[in-house]
């Protein structure tokens, strides 16, 4: 069976989405000097770096950037057989009292974001947590919504969204399969 692929965002579309998200973060927050960006591996961290660069370009604010690996906090792993080589997230920046913007590539069920929230809240007490995602595809299983969205793409459960970024994949596009 042939898999049909449709490009949802090309390189320019991704760049424009990141620019819009960055401006929305600036507009939503009274000051951006209290913002910490937290990217979820393995594409949210790259998108967070791009937002960081845009905030620096527009507001001349060098927002701290953290990366989280949510593997330790997932709700679909068997903790008894947990791989002890997986390290818990340690933040270099104190997130307590800060406005934390979690960045991820695709928002789907909300479970990845819940794991990210657990990772952050187990270590700190931010003043506020906001969520930025490049693609919101719907189908939540948890009451989570994004504050900043690049593009809303309603999908069926049988469809997949793939985000390709130059840093990891050598190409820049978002496709639906």
Swiss-Prot record:
CDD domains: PRTases_typeI. One of its GO terms (biological process) is regulation of DNA-templated transcription. It comes from the Bacteria. InterPro entries: PRibTrfase_dom (IPR000836), PRTase-like (IPR029057), PyrR (IPR023050), PyrR_bifunctional (IPR050137). Pfam families: Pribosyltran. A motif (PRPP-binding) lies at residues 100-112. Substrate binds at residues 42-43, 104-112, 137. Signal peptide: none annotated. GO terms for molecular function: uracil phosphoribosyltransferase activity. The keyword Transferase applies. Its EC number is 2.4.2.9. The keyword Transcription regulation applies. Belongs to the purine/pyrimidine phosphoribosyltransferase family. PyrR subfamily. Regulates the transcription of the pyrimidine nucleotide (pyr) operon in response to exogenous pyrimidines. Also displays a weak uracil phosphoribosyltransferase activity which is not physiologically significant. This is Bifunctional protein PyrR. The lineage of its organism: Bacteria, Fusobacteriati, Fusobacteriota, Fusobacteriia, Fusobacteriales.
């Amino acid at each position: 069976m042939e898999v049909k692929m449709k490009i949802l965002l090309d390189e320019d579309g991704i760049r424009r989405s990141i620019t819009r998200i960055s401006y929305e973060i600036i507009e939503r927050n009274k000051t951006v000097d209290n913002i910490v960006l937290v990217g979820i591996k393995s594409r949210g961290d790259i998108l967070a770096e791009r937002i960081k660069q845009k905030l620096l370009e527009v507001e001349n604010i060098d927002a701290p950037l953290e990366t989280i690996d949510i593997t330790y906090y997932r709700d679909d792993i068997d903790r008894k057989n947990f791989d002890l080589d997986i390290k818990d997230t340690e933040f270099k920046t104190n997130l307590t009292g800060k406005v934390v913007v979690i960045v991820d590539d695709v928002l789907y069920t909300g479970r990845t974001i819940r794991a990210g929230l657990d990772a952050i809240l187990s270590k700190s007490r931010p003043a506020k947590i906001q969520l930025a995602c490049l693609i919101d595809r719907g189908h939540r299983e948890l009451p989570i919504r994004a504050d900043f969205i690049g593009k809303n793409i309603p999908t069926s459960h049988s469809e997949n969204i793939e985000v390709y970024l130059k840093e990891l994949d050598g190409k820049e596009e978002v496709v639906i399969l």
